[in-house]
Amino acid sequence: MADLQAILDSIHTDILPRIGEGKVADYIPELAKVDPRQFGMAIVTVDGKVYRVGDADIAFSIQSISKVFMLTLALGKVGESLWKRVGREPSGSAFNSIVQLEHEGGIPRNPFINAGAIAVSDVVMAGHAPREAIGELLRFVRYLADDESITIDDKVARSETQTGYRNVALANFMRAYRNLDHPVDHVLGVYFHQCALSMSCEQLARAGLFLAARGSNPMTGHSVVSPKRARRINALMLTCGHYDGSGDFAYHVGLPGKSGVGGGIFAVAPGIASIAVWSPGLNKVGNSQLGAVALEMLAARTGWSVFGD
């Protein structure tokens, strides 16, 4: 394998002059306070080696990247029947679009847009109190990363609860179409807390390693999902993981990935490694501007694109 530390160092050197590009997510008050002049990146290979550069050990709000872990939990609970409640197609619309949801009868286009993730949170609740569902997610992510220090940032969760009017609208829409089983405020309580998961690049890359290793965590030896399910989650990340910038990300980077408005991007090189990058400045579709640039550099310098080198 190429000298990954040297590649990471070269990416960091090339990114440094551009640090601060993009715009932080100012519609969530707590995220508006984050200094955009930060950049971190971590790679964990399937043989357990860890490579990092920059601010890879600083915890940030993973936001929509949490949807990958919630989807994994939901599929574990209800299997393929999940797809009766949420689709598997790219949306082509903004991640918080209401128009599409109404047009399609309350069935969200995919599990990674906000409406789809809210439906997935409803499935994970499975009759339990919000606190129990949040606890289940936190235990799961700590287990995946083998790190008990991972937490949920209550300030961020509160900040989203106070300003998430559009998510309230999406949830009420789905409840009206009978695609939510639990009270709207309970489901949103889970959703806002899952998005407030706080992790570093290294923790995130460790937690997602099972998706690079056919569903098992090679560092612990634990099977998380079947190889088939890991492959399908990766397929969804490739086609739907970056909102209406998913096609552009596939074109430039060519790896399954999931972004979040906290500036993080999680990506998978199947059979090789999991990758996490963080830079808080976002582009116009809500994805980390420099994070995407760094991953494009990584794919070019390693030949890891799933479409060939």
From Swiss-Prot:
InterPro entries assigned to the protein according to its UniProt record, in alphabetical order: Beta-lactam/transpept-like, Glutaminase
EC number: 3.5.1.2
Residues binding substrate, per UniProt: 64, 114, 160, 167, 191, 243, 261
The UniProt record lists the keyword Secreted: no
GO molecular function, one term: glutaminase activity
Segments crossing the lipid bilayer: none
Keyword annotations from UniProtKB, A to Z: Hydrolase
Coiled coil: none
HAMAP family, sorted: Glutaminase (MF_00313)
Family the UniProt entry places it in: Belongs to the glutaminase family.
PANTHER family xrefs: GLUTAMINASE (PTHR12544:SF29)
SUBUNIT field: Homotetramer.
NCBIfam families per UniProt: Gln_ase (TIGR03814), PRK00971.1-1 (NF002132), PRK00971.1-2 (NF002133)
Name of this chain's protein: Glutaminase
Species whose genome carries this gene: Rhizobium leguminosarum bv. trifolii (strain WSM2304)
High-level lineage: Bacteria, Pseudomonadati, Pseudomonadota, Alphaproteobacteria, Hyphomicrobiales
